[in-house]
Amino acid sequence: MINTIYKSALITGAGNGIGYETLKRFLKEKIKVYALDKNIKKLKILQKQFKFNIIELDLADTNKLYRELSKLKIDILFANAGIGRGAEGILYASRDDIEISTKINMESCLHTLKAIVPKMVKNRKGHVILMGSLAGLYPQISTVYGGQKGAIHRIAQSLRLELSGSRVKVTEICPGRTKTNFAKAAFTDKTKAKKFMSGFTLLEAKDITDAVMFALSTRWRSNISTIEISGTEQSPGGVPIYPVKDPILS
């Protein structure tokens, strides 16, 4: 159960996957929700069952981001939006992949924080939840995506320090591989996408939502800083070894 001091929330990337699952859970808890996404098709359908606000917005449009979000006064920010473009690594990512994914995964997060957090501090109440990743905590073969999520990890840590004493909490959720549409966008090769999402039992969106709800259930004196959640069959880290096929013998 969400701490009763929180009455309203903004969820970015609410139209699918983890954001959508969390939206439904918030609505069941009677939280006033602003659901933001570029694609609002599923949100429109859900709006026939529940009362909530939809913000149709591409987070790459920074000017519109500030125009829309500066109007809001909320208690919970779930900065969940992200894309997988470029996740195949620096050797395969295009220039556009790098630019667009950096804008969405990293820059828009900072702009969203700037638009929302000062009002939380002024109101002396709030909880910021940032969507990180195991790829941001452990080196993996994903220089682009891993680097961006590594930046989110540092942003979360620094924000927590910056907001000390403000009564605004900061939590970073770091999931492992989760059954969402991530791989479809991350890999141009369908075979690679299928391989990435197979071989073990994946997390599901509801598992990540459980972690979000846990962080939001704590008393004011308790701040869950980082939640690292992986599938039971997934062990992050490790030491992969790839022998060189044509070593230089000198």
What residue spans do the PLM features occupy?
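Active-site helix of classical SDR
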Residues: L113, Q148-K149
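Conserved mid-core segment of classical short-chain dehydrogenase/reductases
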Residues: G84-E99, V144
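Conserved glycine-rich cofactor-binding loop
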Residues: G15-N16
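Residue(s) in the substrate-gating loop at a strand-loop-helix junction
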Residues: S133
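A short, exposed helix-loop element centered on a Lys and neighboring polar residues
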Residues: L113-K114, Q157
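C-terminal helical subdomain
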Residues: E172-I173, T191-G238, Y242
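Active-site-adjacent segment of SDR/Rossmann-fold oxidoreductases
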Residues: S158-V168
